[in-house]
């Protein structure tokens, strides 16, 4: 099945309570598949096409504030419209999941694949000092697997979590093993597991208030310090990556998502030419595996960062390596996906 379809199937199977979204190419199959599967007749999961991306993210905000597993999906310009709601959720410490199947920009751009939302995703695309957890799948299998993982991390840390995919993975068809069914949590389970949730007044506690607003600067500073401490905890415990053939390599390619899949083929071609090249794939783009990249790059003749953009993750790679090794970037723009041969040529030309 397609990567987008895998998102829909996995959402139902992992006990999601609701999906609120709006169709946009190249991710429309997510909501289309959910509409075809009609989970409201089986698990009770709500599926609603909102009137806009702004409406859908605020529906997610409301559902998540009640302790529900809810998600949305969109593509680059649609996700840009959601940034206010995502910032509100981060500030109010509300867990939710959103999927970005990236397309080229800026602006309306193109419907073709891109990875140009890296900055927006890893720096917090709205206002204020906040981060969202960012998972970058490179296969249809990971599209399915990361739905439940994103929910688990979001609720563990009371923080929004993003699956940052792109049009290649979203439209690509592969075999996939779907996760086993999890039942949706009952109201009593939500009350016990998430005491912060707005589940209605009970006799044994004060009413819960979900908000990101605080007018007293001293109190707001303490809230921000609390968030920063939480982000450090996430950095310490949730870094994920995949390193292949890095130890005995002369050169290192760092890439994520579909660009990493293409880089795998490029490395096969490079090996045939006698070049010893390893691949480092960040799976969490935030928290970023800075220390692990620095260790993998140590002693290499050069590092090539391959992205389908003008050069975004390369800045984090350069910060991680801190000038110890040569770091160059190769990417294609406008929705053009690089060929493996182009990556090999860039490796030889730049390094």
Spans of features found by a protein language model:
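N-terminal glycine-rich anion-binding loops that anchor highly charged ligand groups
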Residues: 1-36
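Glycine-/acidic-rich phosphate or pyrophosphate-binding loops and their flanking alpha/beta elements
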Residues: 2-7, 228-251, 264, 268
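Thiamine diphosphate
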Residues: 29-123, 133-155
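Structural signature of the thiamine diphosphate
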Residues: 132-189, 302, 342-350
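Conformationally flexible catalytic loops at phosphate/diphosphate-handling active centers
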Residues: 158-243
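Generic long, charged, amphipathic alpha-helical segments
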Residues: 263-296
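Peripheral docking tails and interdomain loops at the edges
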Residues: 307-351
């Amino acid at each position: 099945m397609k990567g987008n379809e895998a998102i829909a199937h996995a959402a139902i199977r992992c006990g999601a309570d609701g999906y609120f979204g709006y169709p946009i190419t190249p991710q429309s199959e997510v909501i289309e598949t959910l509409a075809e599967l009609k989970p409201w007749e089986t698990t009770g999961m709500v599926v609603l096409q909102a009137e806009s991306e702004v409406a859908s993210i605020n529906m997610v905000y409301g559902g998540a504030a009640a302790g529900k597993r809810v998600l949305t999906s969109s593509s680059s310009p649609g996700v840009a419209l959601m940034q206010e709601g995502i910032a509100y959720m981060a500030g109010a410490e509300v867990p939710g999941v959103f999927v970005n199947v990236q397309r080229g920009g800026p602006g309306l751009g193109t419907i073709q694949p891109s990875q140009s939302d890296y900055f927006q995703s890893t720096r917090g695309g709205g206002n204020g000092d906040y981060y969202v957890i960012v998972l970058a799948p490179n296969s249809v299998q990971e599209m399915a697997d990361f739905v439940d993982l994103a929910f688990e991390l979001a609720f563990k840390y009371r923080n929004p979590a993003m699956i940052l995919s792109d049009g290649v993975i979203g439209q690509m068809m592969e075999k996939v093993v779907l996760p086993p069914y999890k039942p949706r949590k009952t109201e009593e389970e939500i009350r016990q597991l998430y005491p912060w949730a707005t589940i209605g007044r009970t006799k044994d506690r004060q009413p819960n208030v979900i908000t990101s607003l605080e007018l007293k600067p001293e109190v707001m500073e303490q809230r921000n310090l609390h968030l920063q401490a939480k982000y450090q905890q996430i950095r310490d415990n949730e870094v994920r990556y995949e390193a292949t053939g890095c130890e005995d390599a002369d050169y290192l390619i760092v890439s994520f998502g579909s660009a990493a899949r293409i880089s795998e083929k490029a490395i096969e071609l490079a090996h045939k030419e006698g070049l010893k090249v390893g691949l480092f794939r960040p799976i969490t783009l935030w928290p970023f595996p800075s220390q692990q990249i620095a260790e993998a790059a140590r002693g290499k003749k050069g590092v090539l960062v391959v992205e389908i953009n003008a050069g975004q993750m390369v800045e984090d790679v350069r910060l991680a390596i801190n000038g110890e090794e040569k770091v160059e970037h190769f990417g294609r723009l406008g929705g053009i996906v690089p060929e493996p041969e182009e990556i090999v040529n860039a490796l030889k030309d730049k390094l």
